[in-house]
Amino acid sequence: MEKIAAVIVTYNRLALLKECLQAVQEQSKKVCSIVVINNASTDGTTEFLETIDDTRLVVKTFETNRGGAAGFSEGISIATRQGADAVWIMDDDTIPQSDTLIKLVDTMDNHQDAGFVCSKVVWTDGSVHMMNIPGYVSHDELCADLYAIRSASFVSLLVPCKIVREVGLPYKEFFIWVDDAEYTSRIFKAGYKGYLNNNSVVLHKTGANYGAGIKVATPDSAWKFYYYMRNSMFASRGERPWIVWFFRHLNHLRLDIRRTKNMPVEVRGAFKKNLWRGFVDGLTFRPTVDYVSDEES
């Protein structure tokens, strides 16, 4: 697998984007292109990207913030149309080591059944990042530091473009959250294998090592839980009989609302409102898969 395109989605995190880009440019396995989707940043990102002297850089700037999901969908589409063999997907706060990519590529090349391969994601203290623990098929090693997985995050994920063309793009309508889990699960359900290479390591440079659950939610993140509930409901649709699916998510809603009791009174209502809205909209939310069109510009 020779031609690897890096796909980076960014929004108002210029300092982290600079670190991410430098780390991508310094890979021992050189990428053929670096596709940056700028989600209408207002912190100088647009101006900074205009100063970069690298012919591999491809920048698409949205006029409005369309969310990470639309950014990844657009970036993967651009890289695939430009003839890459695979896309290496990451957020702007992902800092790869110099050999991160080559180790992903080696795993992909040695496993013809691979639909995606992800890196081990750590926080600044070297501990495993709670936000990016993949969905394991088994916790048993297949071989040294290689594990079978069924889902992974968009924090250092390698996907062959032939599979992108087959299964389509991530749902841009998700806006944020669950887009990566749904997409990798879709590839897995199409009959391909997923792998975690623990020797391929990236730093996820968040402010703290936290997961995505409501137990660790910050007061200003209430709006995100609308997308969490709605997208989670869609992603699991069809896995069980409708009535089981309905009551399963109704129970999740009940438990999450109960967990808001530990939150400050002034933000509790916002969390409840967004969870309820997400649940109601999740009953009818039905986005359709977009496929790569080579006629697009």
Report residues per predicted region.
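Short, acidic, metal-binding catalytic loop of nucleotide-sugar glycosyltransferases
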Residues: 22-31
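A conserved acidic beta->alpha catalytic loop
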Residues: 23, 38-47, 64, 94
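Glycine-rich, basic loop-to-helix element that forms the pyrophosphate-binding segment
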Residues: 62-82
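Conserved donor NDP-sugar-binding/catalytic core segment of glycosyltransferases
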Residues: 99-129
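Non-catalytic, C-terminal membrane-associated alpha-helical segments of glycosyltransferases
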Residues: 114, 241-297
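A recurrent flexible, glycine/aromatic-enriched loop bordering the glycosyltransferase active site
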Residues: 140-159
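A short, conserved alpha-helix in the catalytic core of glycosyltransferases
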Residues: 163-168, 173-206
